[in-house]
Amino acid sequence: MDQRPELLSSMEYVASPDPKPGVPLRVAENVAPGAEDWLPSASGHLAWATSLETEHQTHLELSEEQRLQISKELVDLQIATHHLREQHEAEVFELRREILRLESRVLELELHGNGACQGHKVQPMANLGQHQVPPLEPPGGQQKLQEELKWLLEHHRARQQALETQVGVLSQQLQGAREEARTTGQQLASQAMVLASCKGQLRQAEAENTQLQLQLKKMNEEYAVRLQHYARETVENASSTNQAALQAFLESTLQDIRAAHRTREQQLAQAARTYRKRLADLNQRQELLLTTCRATFATAINLEPLPMHWATELSHPRENEYGRHRTLLLYPEKGSGETSKENKSQPLALDTASWAQIQQRLQDFSQDTQAELERERAQLMVRATMAEQQLSELQEYVDQHLGRYKQEILKLRKLVNIGDPQGVEAVSSPGSGGARL
């Protein structure tokens, strides 16, 4: 019962794809130039997409835990089967040694009996009454040994049947574990289909978000035109007596712009923290995956060689055993030589062939597992590099906008301190940029 391919098939599902950490940034890149200033208004759609990704990522993590648990159960079943086989082989060896001891005892008694019979024939008939040799062996000694040998054979047959029953139960459990692994694979495939459909919905939501951002841009341009018009009217209607009211209006406008800038900074800082957290989570999951695969592979390597063709080994040796013992009972001298030759040649050839085949399978399994781990490590490294690039771009984006906001605030402060009513027209250009936020 070779279970190495099943171990390989159960490990093929260790790795699963994560939602790409660059989705929020891709939404910002699809917007027309200058549209990144309107991202706060689309936070609801972005939060919905993020929650959808988190939910499906949780399902994928659960399926990974199920696959690891099934792989562990398969390895435990294989170890239990191996221990049972070792116990069976030890009992068979003890029984064979006991049979050989009894065979040697029978041969020894037969030789003594034959020698005693020949000695009695040579002696004169006159000395039979004076000096009679006592029999060396009781009349029923050989029959008793044969009965004991038959009892040992029956006991061995019963033990072998019990071990076959245990092996059958373990085989059924292993088949159930394989069915469970197949069911888990089907569930994973269905979850992958659901994830693909959710990705389609996410792309549709991104398209809708882009359209909403374009509409927001048009509305901001319209409001900027209105603000410019209202500023001109205010300058035209302002007089020396209304200078204080104009300054109060400019102060309130400046406070609104500062509040918008502060909100924008908080949103960008939150996005940067989210990217850092996702990058750390990705690195942690990579380390956990590599550790789990390494532990499973080490457990598989530490297993001792198992005998091949177990079903054939359970059926044919029994018939050979009965034939050999029948030969021993009928021809004791012929049976002892054949028994010693079989015990020396057959296990040695079987162990050598089994060990060579298992060593080849372990080597193939190690090469395939190593190649798969290398591919997965390369993919994770690429994803980590992409996440770092996106994080650096986001940091640069935050620094650039903070610098621009500071320049706009300085310009507005200069205009308020000067108190020039004609400078209100210059407020329209930075004010429109603040309104877009």
Curated annotation (Swiss-Prot):
Q: Which Pfam families match?
A: DUF4472
Q: Which domain of life is it from?
A: Eukaryota
- For this entry, list what GO says about its biological process: cell projection organization; de novo centriole assembly involved in multi-ciliated epithelial cell differentiation; skeletal muscle contraction
Keywords from the UniProt entry = Cell membrane, Cilium biogenesis/degradation, Coiled coil, Cytoplasm, Cytoskeleton, Membrane, Sarcoplasmic reticulum
| Coiled-coil segments | 83-114, 147-287, 360-408
Cell compartments where the protein resides: Cytoplasm, Cytoskeleton, Microtubule organizing center, Centrosome, Centriole; Cytoplasm, Perinuclear region; Cell membrane, Sarcolemma; Sarcoplasmic reticulum
Q: What is its main location?
A: cytoplasm
Spell out the InterPro entries in the cross-references.
CCDC78 (IPR039873), DUF4472 (IPR029329)
One GO cellular component this record assigns the protein to is: deuterosome
Relate the protein's function as given in its record: Component of the deuterosome, a structure that promotes de novo centriole amplification in multiciliated cells that can generate more than 100 centrioles. Deuterosome-mediated centriole amplification occurs in terminally differentiated multiciliated cells (G1/0) and not in S phase. Essential for centriole amplification and is required for CEP152 localization to the deuterosome.
Similarity comment: family membership: Belongs to the CCDC78 family.
The protein's name: Coiled-coil domain-containing protein 78
Q: What organism is recorded for this protein?
A: Mus musculus
Gene this chain is encoded by? Ccdc78
